Amino acid sequence: MFTNLANSAKASVFFIIAFGLTVTVSLLYPLLGQLTPFIHMFTPMLSVLIMMLVVTRDGYSKAGWATLGLHRARLRWWLLALAGPLVVIGMVYGLVWSTGVAHAVVPDGLFTPAALASMLGSGLGLSCALAMGEEIGFRGYLLPRLMQLGTTRALLLSGLLHAIWHFPLMLLTPVYPIFGNWLIVGPIILLTLTAAGVFYGYLRLSSKSVWPATLAHGAINWFFALFAGLTVTASPLALEYLAGETGVLTLVATALGAGVILYRLRPRRGTLAIHLPAGV
């Protein structure tokens, strides 16, 4: 259809499609109900299929699919993908628990082999499966097509666009209940997700695989849910402003991590790149 689109044009069209799909899915919440967030998470992957099979037709060649980073597992990056989210979220909730705003409550039997196997399988496994739909779109397809901007700008822009893509679901549906002031919470979410995107993108570029980024994204969502489930507070609003994806502490920790990554990339600018074959 448009086989000679520049990478910048491909990135723009991809995001327009992905954003349009998530707005549509969000508006269909009265019909879709609890299926809405699950369908929403796969709209970026659907956008990739539309781009590669209909718009640019890159998907009719092996080289086209190779640019998504699906063919390498890169297991040696998986430890960092798990450890990074655990350290950040553990520190955030540890600080919250230490202030007395909230308290940790560990149910009996939580750390038995059976319970751990269940959490890892149905919890982390499902979270990663859902995150895959987003990561194939934003880190698999979009990020490589932004690399002509330079590594730092590409990482930040892919993270920012990913953050913006979340907003229709948050604003048009009750899927993500927000108790705080949106003028405060909205910018925090935007900046936190942008910073998290730097980490996902770093894993994608360093490993040349989308799977470490998928694992990191799934792990972050799962650890947020796990730590929130272990937390009891008399002030949900205070907790919302401090922890979770809407928390100031989460923003600070994530931004510091992103800052370290971007600083480390400065001397090696241009080395973390994905070179797309001509015409892809």
Region spans (language model):
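Alpha-helical transmembrane segments
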Residues: 10-24, 43-48, 80-89
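Membrane-helix interface linkers and caps
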Residues: 2, 34-83, 94-112, 257-277
